[in-house]
Amino acid sequence: MWHKRIIEQNPYPVDNLVGKLLSMVSQDKEKIHEVLSSPRQIVYSKAACVLNGVQRLKKAKENKEKVLIAGDYDCDGVCSTAIMKYSLDQYGILNGYYIPDRVKEGYGLQVHTVELAKEKGYSLIITVDNGVKAFAAIEKAKELGIEVIVSDHHQIEEPVPVDILVHPDLMEKEYRYFSGAGVALQISYYLIGEVKEMIVLAGVAALGDVMPPFAQTRPLIQKAVQYLQEGYMPALQKLVPKGNQINVQIIQFSIIPKLNSLGRMSHLANVNQLVLYLLTRNEEAQIKMAKQIDHINQERKKVSQIKAKELEEKVQDQAIEVLYDPDLLEGVCGLIAGRITNKINRPCLVLTKTDGDMIKGSGRSIPGVNLFEALKDFEFYEAFGGHEQACGLSVLEENFSAFENYVAEIQLAVNQEVGKEALWIETEDFSFQAVQSLMKLEPYPSEWKNPFVWIEHPSQIVFRNYPSMQKYEFEVNGEKVEAVLYANKGIQADSKATNFIGTLSMNSFRNQEKIQMIIEDLW
């Protein structure tokens, strides 16, 4: 159900459309002020944990030690690994890296990886985007005489038994919203100085992990977009469809899904190859690998769309949906959970059966429901981690019924009706300039999303039908709008629709800008 939000006054010194949207999505004036403020400069942490990590790496160079970078298979983990690999190479430290197979090995530093590192002659391991829960692997490293630097941003639940932990909780307040790549960037800076390509990787990773775009995370993302537009990191540019200008939305919906696809579709590709792709300067190799990445992403889309449709039919009226399919690819659980969460406007867990008797999967939440806090107290997890808006978990099949009962028991704690709101647009507030101003405020915090607007009875409506989408062209206050309804929204197109709800953006194609609406609903 949609609620029409009518806001009479604009309390901010911006276009009426922008000010009213900000009033709708947040009452936090401090955060709104930060979004409206001029872009800030990137400043690097001087925290002791960062400097201690840097000093240990410098010592490794002096001693001619071999350093193993232990990464992760999602966008943030791959970008973190690439940042650390590039930095150690440039500084002259002997190093290698390894990202585990999502299905066969699971998340984080594993005991067998530590054992293999010992066989290969590594004396120091640095984790990136993981490590705060790798207790068994850290213990094994101590037994084998290998030192471990944990560089991570995930929530710390128990003390991490390492001498050097580099983590936002131990850094200045400005860095509290960093992803794993943001943490890796701090170490990189003190080894090789500021490198624009590394800023791009860290900014893209922050978007990939949906980090709150405040404090030092905000200029990091803004600079990443700017440097990508200026031509830095051509490997990432090759993941953007030709003719499209790079912006936050292009990164979120084109670059990041492709970077994530190799980890999700681990039966088709080795995610470790993605680090080579990001760092290679060979254009021919970039072009070849970009095509392969695109192919894998297309396969990921096919699988997730088919399975999402099947699981949507199993949705019941629960506050937290628990959907199980034993034949589902583990790597697409989070994608499907996110899609269903957006559709039903409730938290959703999507789980599958892996080798043996283990059930694993991912969950996604909605603003106002902290999924991590809601689920963290179940006593029979084999593995559990995440944050407010997302989680990953593993339980033995014999404990799955107990888990379902546990979720059912916490229903009342999160059973809140969160209606979807859309700002009703007054015709005189709508202009090309206003939508341009709105785009300059990106990236939006995840709790704001890209705010929905409600356009009622526009003029000059023209309907066009395409294989994967439908388009409506219409005018509002004399401004032309192209409204796009994608097939994967699961909404029936109506050529006679006069009410359109969706998000606004500027679509730049072949140097021509036009107002675009991505339709969320219509009638």
Language model features with spans:
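Flexible glycine-rich surface loops and low-complexity tracts that mediate binding to linear polymers
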Residues: 496-510
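Beta-strand/loop nucleic-acid-binding surfaces
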Residues: 478-492
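OB-fold/S1-family single-stranded nucleic acid-binding modules
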Residues: 510-523
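Beta-strand elements of well-folded, non-transmembrane domains
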Residues: 425-427, 504-506, 523
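Conserved phosphate-handling catalytic cores of large alpha/beta enzymes
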Residues: 117-118, 127, 132-211, 217-220
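Hydrophobic helix-and-loop "lid/oligomerization" segment in the mid-to-C-terminal part
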Residues: 4-124, 144, 192-405, 418, ...
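Accessory interdomain/linker segments of ATP-dependent helicases and helicase-like nucleic-acid enzymes
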Residues: 423-481
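Non-transmembrane, aqueous-exposed alpha-helical and coiled segments at domain scale
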Residues: 413-419
